[in-house]
Amino acid sequence: AKAAIEEVEGAQLNLKSCASNYSPSLAGQAFAELMQLNHKPSVILCSNDVLAVGAIMQARKMNISVPEDISITGFDDIDIAEIVTPTLATVHVPHGRMGQAAAGLLLKMRAGDTNNKSIKLSTNTVLRESLRYYP
């Protein structure tokens, strides 16, 4: 999150970073803290879909409407993103291809190939109902 904030500092955006463990309830607590700020956010970008669902659940408890009052996005595009209401905007990660690539590298390492390399996999945004300006 720190590198992303540094990258967009020149855009004069008002960004606030909030850390949470991989827990919907802790994400809900982080969401509640963000809603106490003088300048409330218009969008919450969560590092994974589980945290985003925790934020949506907390918004509901606080009578904050998603997406009318705030947009919430996740990252992963796991099944829960299509089950939660409203459906969750997210970034699709090709988990199957990621696993295949990792297994292939492990097999090469086991065979003595120490030429570790970085593998880039394409992701894409999945626009859903949790965005205020959902197409």
What role is predicted for each listed range?
Residues 1-135:
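Bacterial carbohydrate/catabolite-sensing allosteric modules
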